[in-house]
């Protein structure tokens, strides 16, 4: 697929610290956060003018699903716009708390685990053709996804019975099977529930739920960009070495616990390979593929960063990607802090630092303090991110949804939308079904808007 639809869903962790007598449960905090959303959307599950979906997921986790994007830079921009929208809700909720005499700070974390060991996710969505063999897609992808964390994990200090260890991935400890149709009870690597949110005869949505939520724009670009290249190779029939893993779930944990990328995991054919070797195999195939087929600026940037990250892991010279890869940026931050205060990795102060990296409040979050200092690389500009808070992507179906919502709100019309339906709740109950996510112009939608 030369042009692909991408989407990211990020669940956020919520917590509140109180200085007064009155304390709020996570549910109550989430209600404060979403009060403004409910006041204009009459629900805690809404679609926004930029085409995105914002809702309260199970366990009081706010979730932001980007609109459909057809290039990775735009996807990163819209994911960051989601952070800004949630930061706005947070500031608003804190103000409301103060007005009601409750002394407390609300924190929103874009991470994947809380202190109680619960996990919540970052789900990646890739549109693929219906005609391909989904089983083969999964077979080729799983070894890539299991080892991909070495280049795009978010990093985490994990407390184990043998002491604290630094892992490259947050999500790895919480994945229990390779391919499954459940997302919460048993967390698989690829979710197979068949909901294409598009014409089911033509398309299928590949739902990858193994990845970490990224603060770094460049890590996010690499995560989705490299996965897209691997998908394109599979779709083009590129012959790949069989790297199927004997036990993907054991392998994912082993890879996560090894910052050197050298620990060997067992393949289904009895041989062994390290995460570095497996990633290098996919990278060299992807490089050949782009050389043969030609690639755009984004794919060249992805390949360059992918290679440099593997080089950094292999040589142990993490400075090579300290400005671009989440787990490395965070690791170096923690190590500097530990040296300065002579702390063990198991120190509660280190755990606090680990968490503060993911705080989306720009005046408080450690990632944003690094960004303000110019210590991390960017993909999107602040202006583009600000625009993306209210303007949908212009080349996908999101444009139709965003325009419809904007007009209906301006005209104060009652409406219902989801990923494929646009409906005016008037006597005629006029509905337009948008089954092609690539289509950004549709006379039926224009007519629906004109008739408001």
From Swiss-Prot:
Q: Give the EC number(s) under which this enzyme is classified.
A: 6.3.1.19
Annotated residues for binding of Mg(2+): 9, 55, 63
The transmembrane segments are: none
Has UniProt tagged this entry with the keyword Transmembrane? no
Q: Detail which positions bind ATP.
A: 53, 66, 419
Q: In which pathway does it act?
A: Protein degradation; proteasomal Pup-dependent pathway; Protein modification; protein pupylation
Keywords from the named record? ATP-binding, Ligase, Magnesium, Metal-binding, Nucleotide-binding, Ubl conjugation pathway
Reaction equation(s) it catalyzes? ATP + [prokaryotic ubiquitin-like protein]-L-glutamate + [protein]-L-lysine = ADP + phosphate + N(6)-([prokaryotic ubiquitin-like protein]-gamma-L-glutamyl)-[protein]-L-lysine
Record keyword ATP-binding present: yes
Stored InterPro entries: Pup_ligase (IPR022279), Pup_ligase/deamidase (IPR004347)
- Which Pfam family, an example, fits this chain? Pup_ligase
Instruction: Tell me the Gene Ontology biological-process terms attached to this UniProt entry.
Output: modification-dependent protein catabolic process; proteasomal protein catabolic process; protein pupylation
What is the top EC class of this enzyme, as a single word? ligase
Q: Which family does it belong to?
A: Belongs to the Pup ligase/Pup deamidase family. Pup-conjugating enzyme subfamily.
HAMAP family recorded for this chain? Answer: Pup_ligase
Q: Which PANTHER family match?
A: PUP DEAMIDASE/DEPUPYLASE, PUP--PROTEIN LIGASE
Q: Could you tell me what this protein does?
A: Catalyzes the covalent attachment of the prokaryotic ubiquitin-like protein modifier Pup to the proteasomal substrate proteins, thereby targeting them for proteasomal degradation. This tagging system is termed pupylation. The ligation reaction involves the side-chain carboxylate of the C-terminal glutamate of Pup and the side-chain amino group of a substrate lysine.
Name of the protein in its database record: Pup--protein ligase
Species name: Streptosporangium roseum (strain ATCC 12428 / DSM 43021 / JCM 3005 / KCTC 9067 / NCIMB 10171 / NRRL 2505 / NI 9100)
